[in-house]
Amino acid sequence: MDFSIEQKYQELLKIISSVSRETMQDLMHFESLIIQWNKHINLISSSTIPLLWTRHILDSAQIYPLHSDLLHWCDLGSGGGFPAIVIAIFMKEKKTGHIDLVESNGKKVAFLRTVIAQLDLPATVYHCRIEDVTQKIKNPEVITARGLACLDDLLRLIFPLLTQKTIALLQKGRDYSKEIKNASANWQFDLLKHKSKIDENSVILEISQVRSFRG
């Protein structure tokens, strides 16, 4: 869908009520870098390029307001930078907070570091597997993941990073109820469900106080 810049800005304001023009410019710059780099490496499915603003950028933008008061974020399997780069752009506007990105693919790491440098974002990229990052990232207040794994596997991945105060914000599609049921066989957790503002079939699962039945 070919939105004008003003249309994109108005759509963004439906997600976040106050956005500076400088932040809008950063988001547009990020969008252009995605399109440019996606010709050479698979950051997002090429079929979603026409929907890049809504399906990826706005979908990511809705995450940050849920806990914008918390300062140390960590995004797992960051890929093309959704939601991590979008979150970092809003942190830059707020002049507070930092997000750590974890990505194992070297080409995607190069892309993420390029974006962070060009936009001067409060973010650090760790080029490693998620399982190996626990010695590098300590006590994140918020953990995010988008399209990474089923909930049961996600909880296994994030569990070593969790503290009593850590919140996980996990974006899930239409099968989220089944994923919750399957994960509940192995894990106990406190759960809040936030309906997506972009896709009526999707949710953001806010998970805390994760306990494993397996000890």
UniProtKB/Swiss-Prot annotation:
<comment type="function">
    <text>Specifically methylates the N7 position of guanine in position 527 of 16S rRNA.</text>
</comment>
<dbReference type="GO" id="GO:0070043">
    <property type="term" value="F:rRNA (guanine-N7-)-methyltransferase activity"/>
</dbReference>
<keyword id="KW-0698">rRNA processing</keyword>
<keyword id="KW-0808">Transferase</keyword>
<keyword id="KW-0489">Methyltransferase</keyword>
<protein>
    <recommendedName>
        <fullName>Ribosomal RNA small subunit methyltransferase G</fullName>
        <ecNumber>2.1.1.170</ecNumber>
    </recommendedName>
</protein>
<dbReference type="Pfam" id="PF02527">
    <property type="entry name" value="GidB"/>
</dbReference>
<dbReference type="InterPro" id="IPR003682">
    <property type="entry name" value="rRNA_ssu_MeTfrase_G"/>
</dbReference>
<feature type="binding site">
    <location>
        <position position="77"/>
    </location>
    <ligand>
        <name>S-adenosyl-L-methionine</name>
    </ligand>
</feature>
<feature type="binding site">
    <location>
        <position position="82"/>
    </location>
    <ligand>
        <name>S-adenosyl-L-methionine</name>
    </ligand>
</feature>
<feature type="binding site">
    <location>
        <position position="146"/>
    </location>
    <ligand>
        <name>S-adenosyl-L-methionine</name>
    </ligand>
</feature>
<keyword id="KW-0963">Cytoplasm</keyword>
<keyword id="KW-0949">S-adenosyl-L-methionine</keyword>
<dbReference type="InterPro" id="IPR029063">
    <property type="entry name" value="SAM-dependent_MTases_sf"/>
</dbReference>
<feature type="binding site">
    <location>
        <begin position="130"/>
        <end position="131"/>
    </location>
    <ligand>
        <name>S-adenosyl-L-methionine</name>
    </ligand>
</feature>
<dbReference type="GO" id="GO:0005829">
    <property type="term" value="C:cytosol"/>
</dbReference>
<comment type="similarity">
    <text>Belongs to the methyltransferase superfamily. RNA methyltransferase RsmG family.</text>
</comment>
